Amino acid sequence: MTEITAEGNASTTTTVIDSKNGSVPKSPGKVLKRTVTEDLVTTFSSPAAWLLVIALIITWSAVAVVMFDLVDYKNFSASSIAKMGSDPLKLVHDAVEETTDWIYGFFSLLSDIISSDGDEEDDEGDEDTAKGEIEEPPLKRKDIHKEKIEKQEKPERKIPTKVVHKEKEKEKEKVKEKEKPEKKATHKEKLEKKEKPETKTVTKEEKKARTKEKIEEKTKKEVKGVKQEKVKQTVAKAKEVQKTPKPKEKESKETAAVSKQEQKDQYAFCRYMIDIFVHGDLKPGQSPAIPPPSPTEQASRPTPALPTPEEKEGEKKKAEKKVTTETKKKAEKEDAKKKSEKETDIDMKKKEPGKSPDTKPGTVKVTTQAATKKDEKKEDSKKAKKPAEEQPKGKKQEKKEKHEEPAKSTKKEHAAPSEKQAKAKIERKEEVSAASTKKAVPAKKEEKTTKTVEQETRKEKPGKISSVLKDKELTKEKEVKVPASLKEKGSETKKDEKTSKPEPQIKKEEKPGKEVKPKPPQPQIKKEEKPEQDIMKPEKTALHGKPEEKVLKQVKAVTTEKHVKPKPAKKAEHQEKEPPSIKTDKPKSTSKGMPEVTESGKKKIEKSEKEIKVPARRESHQLQNVTKAEKPARGSKEGFEDVPASKKAKEEAEEVSSTKKQKSPISFFQCVYLDGYNGYGFQFPVTPAQYPGESSGKPNSPGPKQ
């Protein structure tokens, strides 16, 4: 620590010299000595340096012993073992003495080194202090003299300024005199202010007394009103027992805190009213977030002396507000329910007479759809008693034809396509299931179309649609030739596809099948679908349950009305072209042959679905439903109405062979070669009758029948 003091002294001397302008004469040699000694002192002042020195000594001594064989290990070890064997205590004592000697010698060296350094430093420090004592007093004296001289000069300077500026001093005195009355005025104001707070305290006490009196009067009035309000609240509580209890507990806490504040603060009543307005509009499900009262208020509040009718009043007001809000909400919910029920009733009424649905996909629930379907099925069952009697006959005849076909199939060419048809049916099932899962994806796109479509459907009357459909059915009953009807439909479908309007054809065919359910031909369709094509059951159930079907129906309702008028004209032209000699021969081929052809059409549509986008898939599946449903229905109708029962047995055998020749290869070739067109290719309709290889088979097939 002596080194530190020496450093401190040196620093003080240098600072003194530097701080003063005078310089002390010193030799440069002494400065160099100081730097060397300071370096040594600073290095060895820390114990780490000494530890390093000791470590170096030990290591290098060991190196010297090993390198130069300074110790005779054998003799040393042998003598030590002999000593251990003879007198172990002596050996221990000798070792301890030797070690202590070494330790004492080492410490003595250290103390000598440190003491010698300290002595040198002390001598240098004493010299420095002596020089400082000699040097410093004259500097201090000079400072004192300078300060005294400066002080003397300053008053001398002030004296002439007084002589010169006497006028200014007079002016200052005048200003001071003016300021004195102002100060007196300020003193008076301060006194008045002191008196005013006293008056304020008095007025506050008076106001508190008045507010207490007012509160007591109000409480008396409120106690009377409370009895009337209790009667009202009991009625309200009977309705809302479950909702109110939680908020009321918290309200009681709020009102208790408010009543405590009223006794303390003069603005308590205002706070009370604000709290009522803030916390009063509590909804039944929500619990109000009540901020805890501040601890300072709690400490300052005395215990409530008055009874708490304010609490009751607050509870009643809040309960009344809750009752009103809840009744309003209930009334709004009931109105919304009534409106939704009215809308569903209106939609039901519109669907039954005109079948132009206006509902959006998602407003009406599935339960309402199920109810409408049940009503429509009841109407259909009433109107469809006569055709239902005719259906079992058609079923039996179709079964006979199906059994006779494998018996009379003589050629392998006709058998192979029938097997492929069966495979195609299986593929169709899988595709229909896959498409039904994918229908939910573009529902949003269809919703946009429904909004525009609904506006058009509301403008157009449902009566027009029903009258047009009646005309269609009359024309279709007249048509007995199956290939001609296929030509008509094929031509219509292809023309619509080429004009980039696939929707009209779908609507034409779906209108009689789905929307105009109450009319007599449709019950046949429903009942014949079940025995003839069991494949269609899962499809229809999946389609009816979804809102996408509504979208398609709405689009169809608009486009059919646009394309209704040209349709009968086309059919009339096709009827004129039909040869009359073949009419009586083919009514029954419809019952079995038609499903095959329609299945081929379905294969076309399903393969086109893969290339076209997802919305096209929905429309094509709708086509399949309708074509399967309508064509067998028409065929069975025509077969039972136009042809007498005596000719049926003879014609069955001829029809089986002719239908095999006509239809089974047609369906095969349609599957294979009509993939790439899909309405984008040819301008003219590509139907089975127009293929060059198969056109020869069609005129030949009716030949033997004539």
Swiss-Prot record:
Residues 117-127 have a biased composition (Acidic residues). Residues 128-254, 309-358, 372-432, 443-518, 525-552, 570-588, 599-621, 628-651 have a biased composition (Basic and acidic residues). Residues 8-24 have a biased composition (Polar residues). It is a single-pass type II membrane protein. Glycans are attached at N75, N625. It is found in: Sarcoplasmic reticulum membrane. The chain crosses the membrane at residues 48-68. One of its GO terms (molecular function) is signaling receptor binding. GO terms for biological process: heart contraction; regulation of cardiac muscle cell membrane potential; regulation of release of sequestered calcium ion into cytosol by sarcoplasmic reticulum. Phosphorylated by CaMK2. N-glycosylated. Residues 1-28, 117-265, 281-663, 684-706 are annotated as: Disordered. Its main location: membrane. Pfam families: Asp-B-Hydro_N. GO terms for cellular component: junctional sarcoplasmic reticulum membrane; plasma membrane. The keyword Membrane applies. It comes from the Eukaryota. Residues 69-706 are lumenal. Keywords: Disulfide bond, Glycoprotein, Membrane, Phosphoprotein, Sarcoplasmic reticulum, Transmembrane, Transmembrane helix. Residues 1-47 are cytoplasmic. Detected in skeletal muscle and in heart (at protein level). Detected in skeletal muscle and in heart. Contributes to the regulation of lumenal Ca2+ release via the sarcoplasmic reticulum calcium release channels RYR1 and RYR2, a key step in triggering skeletal and heart muscle contraction. Required for normal organization of the triad junction, where T-tubules and the sarcoplasmic reticulum terminal cisternae are in close contact. Required for normal skeletal muscle strength. Plays a role in excitation-contraction coupling in the heart and in regulating the rate of heart beats. Interacts with CASQ2. Homooligomer of variable subunit number; disulfide-linked. Interacts with CASQ1 and RYR1 in skeletal muscle. This is Triadin. The gene is TRDN.
